[in-house]
Curated annotation (Swiss-Prot):
It comes from Synechococcus sp. (strain CC9605). ATP binds at residues 166-173, 191-195, 213-216, 280-283, 309-311. This is GTPase Obg. Its main location: cytoplasm. Monomer.
Amino acid sequence: MQFIDQARITVRGGRGGDGIAAFRREKYVPAGGPSGGDGGCGAPVVLEADSNLQTLLDFKYKRLFAADDGRRGGPNKCTGASGKDLVIKVPCGTEVRHLRTGILLGDLTAPGERLTVAFGGRGGLGNAHYLSNRNRAPEKFTEGREGEEWPLQLELKLLAEVGIIGLPNAGKSTLIAVLSAARPKIADYPFTTLVPNLGVVRRPSGDGTVFADIPGLIEGAAQGSGLGHDFLRHIERTRLLIHLVDAGSEDPVADLNVVQQELEAYGHGLVDRPRLLVINKQELVSEDDLPKLQQELKEASGRPVLCISAAMGTNLDQLLAETWVELGV
């Protein structure tokens, strides 16, 4: 399935139904008064968060969403039927903004959470409203009003508590596959992961914690280079980052600094997010050199450094233990 995390749509509330001019016509009331009913209200457009959706793909091919119009009024002061609400399902984690102003209208994070994004127009008034002492047989009625119409920007930010970050080929997909039931595409070349992958990792209590494998960052990602700019938004909601550094890299310290700089450039508080610094693929470094590398990264980052091998399953229990401590679970 194609992963789409941004979409532009237009929503339009239904038009209100027209009021009508009508008069009572009964056998023994030859000169009945006005009885024109009001028009029904136009339907609103409502967005609803749905936990079964993972992408905004549905909005790639359909951009205009128009709700039902209200019905016109009827005789005997009958009000026309209102339009049925147009409910549009979106993934949990969808932010909704006005396209032209950028104003945040809502952030749908909980399943079933709703946001009305366009109200329908009010129904028109029937001529029964215009009866007066001066005019006993008014012909006047009003038309229904147009519904609201707005251009919207939808932006999906995945709901994950833990984000796994690092340069391409650092082993992020392997780690999430080993820790969870996720089955991302894995290969030994950069940019194998082209979309974020989610996996659920069980806590000691048995509850699940969502981990996200974010496609590899490169230098300049925050300015749009590579894949990082498109997907950094998906770690904005995380509570913890696991930063993987490839032990087999030519310059692991430089790799560390690239990711650090990109987090700083992107902003949104990512650089201050709690983070575990982890050397992956420790089997690629000799037992004598591994402590040296660990010390170099510690001095460069000011953080403790864990050593693991996702592929070999080495020290993963220690990594998870540190993760649960950071999350307070």
